Amino acid sequence: MKYYSTNGNTPDVSLQTAVVKGLAADRGLFMPERIPLLPKAFFNNIGEMSLQDISYVVANTLFGDDIESATLKDIVYDTLNFDIPLKHVADNKYSLELFHGPTLAFKDVGARFMARLLGYFNKQQNGNGGMVNVLVATSGDTGSAVANGFLGVPGVRVFVLYPKGKVSLIQEAQFTTLGKNITAIEVDGTFDDCQALVKSAFMDEELNAHMMLTSANSINVARFLPQMFYYFYAYAQLLKQGKDVSNIVVSVPSGNFGNITAGLIGKRMGLPIKRFIAANNRNDIFFQYLNTGVYTPKPSVATIANAMDVGDPSNFARVLDLYKHSHEAICAEISGCTYTDEQIGETMAKTYKETGYLLDPHGAVAYRSLEEGLAENETGIFLETAHPAKFKSTVDAIIGEDIEIPAKLAAFMQGDKQTVEMGSGFASFKKFLMSV
């Protein structure tokens, strides 16, 4: 299958080129030329299938023309060696727990899949001699998921850019203590500054002639598309539990919009989801777009749901492309909401007190949207995107308890921090990359 640029000013490319390049030559994002429908027989049997089996069928439907089935199966099964359970929280509301992977965040799925796929393509393209340099900007969980997903992958170096002082200590420890083929770059600026540095690097001819660059942010098709796997698995678990699946609403904590875009593509492939909610913190750019029809990026605002502190979501271009730039069509399938830190904290405290279920700040945004916007005849699923312990100081203060840190999270805290400090100007970043 070919992949085209959302900007439409560059030739279509293969999956391998889309994955290795990350961003199209015209600065657009790659999209599959067609979105195939899954057969009805798949949905008839999905309730009896495992996460890995479901994910392989979905992956093979989308990527089967480009990767031999045995290799793809190995990649999928190796990626998803952990569970993604659907837990009942209250009434008709369910949490899809995406924090049971190695770094306890939803991005483990996309990052692990991409690491394995990129390693495979790099070997196909360059044998054992080529070096791919992965650039990734992070506002929190992306850095840890990508760094751990790619740790030790032959022929790949990873450079993680993150805003100084704007990620939690636990998140920071997950990508600054690894060493080996992982370099953490501490940028004196915002997440949007980090993202701008990455995009500028891709567009710099001299830099690209010097080294092979790609991105592991959700702008890369191999990062965001695999995230659709768990939407299908959520549906399967509802079926297995004998719940009503006729009117499913999925609320997605939304920052860079890769997660919700993957769900929207899953819906196009036949997944019976009635509608989506894009749940925002105070960074309400998409919410304002829904209300006005005008997309106006603005500087990001720091919140307690920091992984969603994005003022210009990259994947908005994909949402527009999916709906052929129709504001009306987008509003028909996606609603929005926006909450302050106070409202997020209030939801976390209230939910924990009433149900015993502990939300992280991002999941709380999505859960509150279901509390306020779910009809009686609808079944709501919200994505719980990270373990609450990743935001321990915030969560402890809100619920008034000292929550336990899982062992695999605590292990990251033992290492020594290793970072390269840098300003937000591109010249210094380019100079650094040219020297490595």
Task: Name every feature range the model reports, one short phrase each.
Residues M1-V436:
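PLP-dependent amino-acid enzyme catalytic core
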